[in-house]
Amino acid sequence: MTRPQVPAVAVAAATNRSGTVTVRATDQGMPVEIRFERAEYRYGAPALAAEMLRLTQRSAIVARARRREQLAEAGVPEAMLDRLGLPTRQAAVDELDRLDDADTGQTSWLRNR
């Protein structure tokens, strides 16, 4: 029985709310594809660069969670995945929510307990 092939790198994409900027990045945080509409130039280079960095960070978080799942399917023990710092799917969702709150502020009047 052969083990499943694990890709050398995991990649994920993140898109801004308006769908005008998309970044694909590796689990190492390296952007491998950046696409944006020409209209984004109107906000200036610093704003466009900041949006690209934000989306790179978000896609890297998703890619790291995807990488964890790939390695787990290949038989890597949970303890090793934890030591590698690869987040679980839920931890990735929590981190993305935290980033959203930092970007937009709290979206609920309810207090976290």
Cite the ranges covered by each PLM segment.
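Acidic, negatively charged sequence signal
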Residues: 1-22, 36-113
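Short, acidic, Ser/Thr-enriched surface-loop or helix-capping motifs
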Residues: 25-26
